[in-house]
Amino acid sequence: MFGAFIIGDELLVGKREDKHLGFLIGALAKRGLRLAWAHYLGDEPARLTEALKRSFASSEVVFSFGGIGATPDDHTRQCVAAALQVPLVLHPDAEREIRTRFAGQEVTPQRLQMGEFPRGAAIIPNPVNRIPGFSVGEHHFVPGFPQMAWPMVESVLDTRYRERFGSGKWAEASVLVFEAGESQLIPAMQAVERSFAGIKVFSLPSMGADGSRIHVELGVRGDPAQVGAAMERLRREVGAAGFPHK
């Protein structure tokens, strides 16, 4: 199972629009994988630390975007260390990358702070400016800049999780139902979910500008081997209930 943390006050106050969620969904889908959940978090250390504690207690693969720099509003590195109850230490590989990045310039303590990761972490190379991200177990922490974060995430997927590619394949099919409210379609939906363990049923109502109901998109998604039969069963249930559909 794959999850995501997307971190930064700038997202929650509307100063920046998130692009990471759409990217991650697409990057996983290209590899036959699916995103199970995503959480947006501000730059609030206590809340972030608690969220990380819960996440580290699971066996899920988690990508975290943002907050790994060295400015006062960057808390992710510190919160990961707090959640794991380990110190931040200057990672030798990160130090080497930082010194290479700033060759010929003063390598200040502030610059080296960007390479201080929770003890036991591994670095994620940054192909853009060489300031790395880091991994702790199945959790992977990358910068908030898409041009840096995205190739780093794809590299992690391709080097760490190739054996899982295709494990999250799914399919979807739907039908438009007219002259019915969602509540009237519940029996049909329940009948399908009872009969097909690998299938989820969904309903998406559409409204006109005046609030009048136009139709309900009713569908199934899940195991590709079951979608066809589940959709046929759903059509039969809707037809038996007397609702027009196409």
Regions found by a protein language model. Give the residues of each.
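Glycine-rich phosphate/diphosphate-binding loop of Rossmann-like nucleotide-binding domains
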Residues: 1-38, 43, 228-229
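Structural motif
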Residues: 3, 60-61, 115, 122, ...
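Glycine-rich beta-strand-to-loop/alpha-helix junction loops that act as flexible
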Residues: 7-9, 64-72, 143-144, 204, ...
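N-terminal small/polar loop signature for handling phosphorylated ligands or for N-terminal nucleophile
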Residues: 22-83
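Generic secondary-structure signature for well-ordered alpha-helical cores
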Residues: 29, 33-34, 43, 57, ...
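Short beta->alpha linker loops
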Residues: 40-43, 93, 112, 180
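Proline/glycine-rich low-complexity loops and linkers
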Residues: 47-50, 74-164
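An accessory alpha-helical subdomain
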Residues: 138-237
